């Protein structure tokens, strides 16, 4: 088969290394990977065939730089991996494709709803998809009153900015957790914060941030990672997440969940999502929706990023993708670990 060139953005993100490795291990053709990142000291700079520095996704120079790289490298496919870049890429899909590639991204509307948790929760409120009860606040007074409406201080509540990557800005507001225990017995990264601590930070701040306050939901932490096309789920691995460290789960286990599959199918259909997405659930509650690839569990014979690329290039049909569902192995486990590379920086 013809050699394939893939432009992989955010080639230093936590899920990049296994995606690069799995694409390079494809047997039926040679795949050349061109990586981009905002930092030259990332794994992608060493594992990709070629590597280019880019500005941050919110920079006005980001899209022109991507176009420059596309015109230079002539990739067949652009595969985005970062929430910080996905809105810019979706908003400029036509420009990027005019430069000479196919872009694996959902519609601009679907991406913007997915990335804004206020819009996401509002969109699915009173739908078959459960979302936490929430309030959007922009002042200290609203924060305090909304926290009380959601059950604080008798029950903990959560908050985070409507736009944020992963666990950035996420905290659990609770006065029941010992500060002494957090300092002496927990890792330095703790989600818990008391109202007094919150007041110390924001009480005298003239510019109160936009925040989303949510009820504190509990249950098994799972994500679904469907490959979708035109609002339809073609196959959908579901994994539980364990052993979180610094905001990243370190272990994943492939599981079955008809309920989460049904919720994911409704999400995909309603938003008319495309390609690989990632939906995070706590119990039955949708917590986060990433309209991009996230950490994958690779099973023998099942390489979802490569399937998505072939589907985008019309080398396979949706039915052929559906047939691959039988290759999802329940119980297949992935453990994330730290590794190192060594190089001469001269």
Where in this protein do the model-derived segments appear?
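Residues that mark the start of a beta-strand
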Residues: 3-7, 156, 212
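ATP-dependent carboxylate activation and anion-phosphoryl transfer catalytic cores
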Residues: 4, 10, 73, 242-246, ...
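Phosphate-binding site of ATP-dependent enzymes
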Residues: 184-249, 254-263, 267, 283-285
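Preference for protein termini
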Residues: 1-36, 73-81, 129, 185, ...
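ATP-binding N-terminal substructure of ATP-dependent carboxylate-amine bond-forming enzymes
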Residues: 1-105
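Active-site nucleotide/adenylate-binding loops and adjacent lid/helix of ATP-dependent enzymes
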Residues: 111-210
